[in-house]
Amino acid sequence: MIPKYGCLLVGLLTVCGAAAQHPDDEYYPYAARQEERTPLLLTDSTLFYRAVQTTPDLYAEHTAFNLPYVSVKRRGLNYRDESASVGVVRLSSRYFGAMRLLGADEVRYGGLAAADGVTGGVGGLRLFRFTADYPQASRYTAVSFTDRSYLAGARLSVTEPLGCGWSGTAALDARTGRDMHVEGVFTNALTASLRAAKRFGDDHNLSLMLIVPPSVRGTRLSSAEEAFRLTGDRLYNPAWGFQHGKVRNSRVRREFVPLAVVSYRMPVSQSTSLAADFSAEYGTRKYSALGWYDARTPMPDNYRYLPSYADDRETELAWLANDPRYTQVDWDEL
């Protein structure tokens, strides 16, 4: 009887593992998806026994190191809760700007919704559509300035008839510069897009679209409350430091993920039509991070380097003075 109740107790205290947090969309510049939840202590006592080490127990839920989740969890609905598509092809937010420059109409539906054979998420549904009408020749240029993620941007779009029933649109979207609030955060991105469309007869339409969005972004990291308090900066970023007098970020995201879409529309009868969409997306995503072996961690906000660890007054004064040798990555010493 005792072994039976012992097994029952173990079963009740053991739960199946499930991911409670999901990284934000890849376009979100502040996500730090490379960090992982790392428990400081694994117990093997009878009361807090964990039969499978990958599942949480009662003790770990109250004592484990959960700080990385601060950087990968946004408030409100997750970006992935909203679906976006052109036709039946799912779209990432990295292509939204290119779709608008190419002349697509944008329609949004709130909450759970379905339209044109596409089902949205709890965050709503965003649809991009191209009209079947023959487009008129047009030009569009714009210059923008901002203080978050990048400093300046420029957009250009040209639509021209190509003859033989073809029309073409070419667009460029460039963004560059540093964040004016968070040191180390910057963006250098260029999105080039092309679309060619041809109309056969009255209602047959063929379109070819290519979007190439290379980008390099410097991101930020979360930190401990003590680091924010000592520096007096609620946007403190421990990921950067000075190297030969210039700012260098250790967390840089490089992306090159082109998208190609081929669409065909044709009528079958007065009340029926046929639509076919083919897409291909292939590329690389790279995310840099500091690594070390048989050496001290170079991260400046590690708990061993904070004044509270050794009750060091000199270190506290250096942090209060925002000395970059203490508060930032010391590249010159690596």
Where are these regions (language model features)?
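Residue-level detector of the transmembrane beta-barrel scaffold of outer-membrane proteins
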Residues: K73, S83-S85, E106, S138-Y140, ...
